[in-house]
Amino acid sequence: MKDLSIRIAVVGAGGRMGRQLIQAIEQMDGVVLGAALERSGSSLLGSDAGELAGLGKNGITVNESLDAVQNDFDILIDFTRPEGTLAHLAFCRLHRKGMIIGTTGFDDAGKAAIKQAAQDIGIVFAANFSVGVNVMLKLLEKAAKVMGDYTDIEIIEAHHRHKVDAPSGTALAMGEVIADALGRDLKSCAVYTREGHTGERDPKSIGFATVRAGDIVGEHTAMFADIGERVEITHKASSRMTFANGAVRAAIWISSKESGIFDMRDVLSLDDL
């Protein structure tokens, strides 16, 4: 029998990621779906969340109001958009609910609001919840320390046509890890577009290239290129379930934290390696 002690609310339950999260919760021990939410006016309101996810009826009705399900969940998982996530964050902070944030595209003010809320609740805020991506970030840190000062560094990412922010949060996280390892400020050394006569490449720059096409789930490559050789570290996701499973794993982990902001490196204890 499933341990019902950790009840999870999924925001955006009818979306691609929301349905995968509901499936992941159903498959993982120690958690149960406590609430499923959709935006006001959605045609999915009133639907059974289990049926939406292709699992059959589970008795959880898709709701539009966090107030209505306040007592039905302990941890909220949010992979929506910045403005919605910040509204959900305020609710969770007020009612002392832990939060898993997979939303990307926050500006500096949004990131500051998340850090401030973490004074009162436990938050896992990560650009990518895939175990493989987070192992890749650790590898990038090590590669940058060995090769970064004498190679040209480029980050290439590809996603489906529906993704609305670029570069991806994961690509930016890759850049941050590399820049930090080299003692550089990513805001100062990042190059996001190249067009026309650009001049010679700045050897201290970190370049970004973006592809948006078809149904690509997510592909990320960091290239360390020297004269005569280059090293490429790549992660390719073939299913959103890898992100969903990681997010549910993070929800279990954060349930024991009263406050603080963490990422998947904390959840996976990667800094201990």
From Swiss-Prot:
Q: What class of enzyme is it?
A: oxidoreductase
- Is Cytoplasm set as a keyword in this record? yes
User: What is the protein name stated in its UniProt record?
Assistant: 4-hydroxy-tetrahydrodipicolinate reductase
Which residues are recorded as binding NAD(+)?
Answer: 12-17, 38, 102-104, 126-129
Pathway membership of this protein? Amino-acid biosynthesis; L-lysine biosynthesis via DAP pathway; (S)-tetrahydrodipicolinate from L-aspartate: step 4/4
UniProt keyword rRNA-binding present? no
Q: Annotated Gene Ontology MF terms?
A: 4-hydroxy-tetrahydrodipicolinate reductase; NAD binding; NADP binding; oxidoreductase activity, acting on CH or CH2 groups, NAD or NADP as acceptor
- InterPro entries (UniProt xref): DapB_C, DapB_N, DapB_N_CS, DHDPR_bac, NAD(P)-bd_dom_sf
Principal subcellular localisation of the protein:
cytoplasm
What does the record note on quaternary structure? Answer: Homotetramer.
What does UniProt list as this organism's lineage? Bacteria, Pseudomonadati, Pseudomonadota, Gammaproteobacteria, Enterobacterales
Any idea what job this protein has? Catalyzes the conversion of 4-hydroxy-tetrahydrodipicolinate (HTPA) to tetrahydrodipicolinate.
Amino-acid positions noted as binding (S)-2,3,4,5-tetrahydrodipicolinate in the UniProt annotation, renumbered to this chain: 160, 169-170
Q: Which GO biological process categories is it annotated with?
A: diaminopimelate biosynthetic process; lysine biosynthetic process via diaminopimelate
Reading the lineage from the top rank, the first entry is Bacteria
* Species whose genome carries this gene: Pectobacterium atrosepticum (strain SCRI 1043 / ATCC BAA-672) (Erwinia carotovora subsp. atroseptica)
